[in-house]
């Protein structure tokens, strides 16, 4: 699992959504299947400078209290560290430290023996530790490597591939490499990004979220999908039967197609019903006939960043990837304002 608490500016609705996932799906699955070891691949808390007191209180009551009986290995992600250039000052050491016997913090690279399977862990790589950490990657004898990596060619968000990071060839000696950091679940060759365990923005609406279970006999992971979605996008169809309870306290976007000639008479009633649940946020987008034949069509089911990224590609400007990276960073930062 990776990237857990404090996203969306410590919004209490999102915090409750995150914690419900662990209480209702994650921990019950582990207990039912006799799993005793948990590995967290970084970004336990979202904010590098401080932790919201209510977030910490709820995490202590509803997450950390469930760790009894488990071994919880956690490496540092970039959001866990106060400075970008060193891991020395980090929230996990300062706040959690040795208060929980089940909680095992890895500030340095380490190798675990999981029922005979050798698994190497590498925390966030920065200027201060780069040489030592990369030397560990080049020389450790584990067949599986896990970390919090920025690897070239993998998507930060859909359509935006990372540049100026680590060369993927550095990891070719491992059977499998698993990483936190990037939000979208993705795989290429022997490298796999787990992605976030739950939806955080509308860009996640059509992405599969969840956690991964390691089979120590085969060295392979099984994906366990998180069935609880925070974001819902659909085209209104008065003949479709909706379970409106699925939308309670969720973010909903309804696309009303005025171009098809179909009846949309019931949309106002649906909006009233959803608001009375209530939903956390409701957006209605009406798709009208184009006024001009040459007017460009925009897929409004796509998220903001994907639309911007595609527009940058069409513009054919120099350093397009650098511009996408800047816009992505500004967008992510805006979510925490």
Predicted regions and their residues:
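Conserved catalytic scaffold of divalent metal-dependent phosphoesterases
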Residues: 59, 80-169
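Conserved beta-sheet core of the metallophosphoesterase superfamily
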Residues: 151-152, 157-222
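Short, conserved loop/helix-junction motifs that constitute active-site signature segments
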Residues: 64-68, 136-140, 168-173, 245-247
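Active-site environment of divalent metal-dependent phosphoester hydrolases
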Residues: 2-5, 46-49, 75-85, 112-113, ...
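Accessory, non-catalytic peripheral segments of nucleic-acid enzymes
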Residues: 216-337
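Divalent metal-coordination and catalytic microenvironments
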Residues: 38, 43, 59, 77, ...
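Core catalytic region of metal-dependent phosphoesterases/phosphodiesterases
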Residues: 4-111, 170-174
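Hydrophobic/aromatic residues located in beta-strands of well-ordered beta-sheets
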Residues: 38, 72-74, 119, 143, ...
